[in-house]
Amino acid sequence: MDDHAADLLAAVAEVARAAEAADGAAPLDEATWLALRHHPERVRSWVRAGGFALVIGADLSLVVHPQARGRGLGAGLLSSALAGLSAGMPLEAWSHGDHPAAAALARSHGFERARELWVMRRQMASALPQLRAPDGVTVRAFRADSGDAEEVLRVNAAAFAHHPEQGSMDATNLAERMAEPWFDPDGLLLATSAAADGGEQVLGFHWTKVHPGDAGAGAGPGVEVGEVYVVGIDPAAQGRGLGKVLTLAGLHHLAGRGVPEVLLYVESDNRPAIAVYAGLGFTHADDDTHVQYRR
């Protein structure tokens, strides 16, 4: 990482930490942090005292320090970013929390509300149902010294073929995530069955995550929070209840880690998934919603 990239990362981190402390939600997603750390050449940036705007591909991020809000800095950063991009370039921007100020800024610059992502949470003090896998299915942890990584990528690509963020994960993206401090191979659970050639095939996976106590996951400082990070099922194996089985297996793993709360993200219109998660004890608060705007 050269000096410019390091300075950008430091400036972004300082403002993001302050915004997270004030708002109770991290203002940048994991993909943005990974790009800043590993692929700074992909990041276009507009940095001012008290705030910044970033564009990575078609994704726009804009964050203003709490002490610099209400002075037009956000509008100025957004105008500068839009002026520096190709006319008519499609853009997507997330508001991590349904903030009225973000909605007003988006509307004033031609962005429309496009998606809502719910945060659902489960308090782990309540007992979990017993785990029962279907006949012929084994749930086990990821093994780094096997072909598991390739199988996870295969299932992920099939399961999220129509999902713009998750479906594009490749071997490099996977390796970057596995190099993160939070990665635990025991928390990446695979549902497998016997293959026709006598080997083993992966039917689906549940990748769990534990946020450190300072990660702003909403449980208070110093408190670790678990996450249902990704659940992916091979379309050829759907209809067997594997999504619920893998989700429950991950919850048992996170319970063993001692986290008091587990969160997950789900599209607000994915009623079947919401019903499954509600049946496992997850709830959603109206203000625990992330909103995507498009232009």
UniProtKB/Swiss-Prot annotation:
Question: Matching InterPro entries, A to Z?
Answer: Acyl_CoA_acyltransferase (IPR016181), GNAT_dom (IPR000182), MshD_Acetyltransferase (IPR050276), Mycothiol_AcTrfase (IPR017813)
Q: Name one GO molecular function term.
A: protein-N-terminal-alanine acetyltransferase activity
Q: Where does acetyl-CoA 2 bind?
A: 231-233, 238-244
Residue numbers binding acetyl-CoA 1: 62-64
Output the superkingdom of the source species: Bacteria
Describe the function of this protein: Catalyzes the transfer of acetyl from acetyl-CoA to desacetylmycothiol (Cys-GlcN-Ins) to form mycothiol.
This chain's protein is named: Mycothiol acetyltransferase
Q: Which organism is it from?
A: Nocardioides sp. (strain ATCC BAA-499 / JS614)
